[in-house]
């Protein structure tokens, strides 16, 4: 296994990991059941907003939300639209407590532009989302940005509808050390 970079406290530097590596940690051990329960509660809370496609992955330990980029940005723009606030605000609670969640922002595009354009666009859009969270009181110390460009389509890029589905933001809420520690101390249910 490759050696993982650590910060000055000895914690793994999540910014140096691939998305797949981030999605595979932490090993929850005995706390898995409590974490799954907490993630189910968080999913139910987010479902009330009815603004994104939600699912639990990795044995129900990681919450994945998918938001349409058209709800966040104007076409080919990197500035958040006025209505983006409606879609992003429900996720602020996940960023209130530092290291409660490791949040992965994965921005996708369709394949209508060049590879370089798509990567630049998705990078700028993901940064705009992270900056919005910061401006609105979220702690973004444990937020990692991934620009996916057009590399991971979920629909055919041959149709308008397919391209619209491919332009999306995936938000992954991965249990952080604070959440695991709270589960260990029996404080997660409070």
Regions found by a protein language model. Give the residues of each.
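Short, well-ordered turn and helix-capping elements at secondary-structure junctions
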Residues: 69-71, 77, 149, 158
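N-terminal targeting leaders that direct proteins to extracytoplasmic destinations
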Residues: 1-59, 179
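Soluble periplasmic/extracytoplasmic beta-strand elements of cell-envelope proteins
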Residues: 55-57, 62-68, 72, 102-106, ...
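Periplasmic peptidoglycan-binding/anchoring modules of Gram-negative envelope and division proteins
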Residues: 39-58, 73-107, 134, 171, ...
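A broad, low-specificity signal for short, low-complexity segments enriched in glycine/proline
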Residues: 16-17, 24-34, 63-67, 104-106, ...
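Periplasmic OmpA-like peptidoglycan-binding domain that tethers envelope proteins to the cell wall
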Residues: 108-187
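Second-shell loop/turn segments in exported
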Residues: 28-33, 72-81, 115-119
């Amino acid at each position: 296994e490759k050696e993982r970079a650590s910060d000055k406290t000895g914690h793994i530097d999540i910014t140096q990991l691939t998305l797949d590596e981030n999605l595979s940690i932490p090993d929850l051990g005995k706390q898995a059941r409590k974490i799954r329960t907490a993630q189910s509660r968080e999913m139910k809370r987010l479902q009330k907003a009815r603004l994104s496609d939600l699912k639990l992955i990795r044995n129900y330990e990681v919450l994945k939300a998918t938001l349409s980029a058209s709800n966040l940005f104007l076409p080919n723009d990197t500035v958040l639209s006025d209505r983006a606030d409606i879609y992003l605000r429900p996720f602020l609670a996940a960023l209130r407590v530092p290291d409660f969640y490791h949040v992965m922002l994965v921005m996708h595009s369709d394949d209508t532009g060049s590879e370089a354009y798509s990567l630049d666009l998705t990078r700028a859009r993901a940064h705009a989302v992270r900056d919005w969270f910061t401006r609105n009181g979220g702690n973004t110390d444990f937020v990692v940005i991934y620009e996916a460009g057009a590399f991971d389509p979920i629909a055919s890029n041959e149709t308008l509808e397919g391209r619209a589905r491919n332009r999306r933001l995936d938000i992954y809420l991965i249990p952080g050390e604070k959440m695991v520690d709270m589960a260990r101390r029996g404080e997660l249910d409070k």
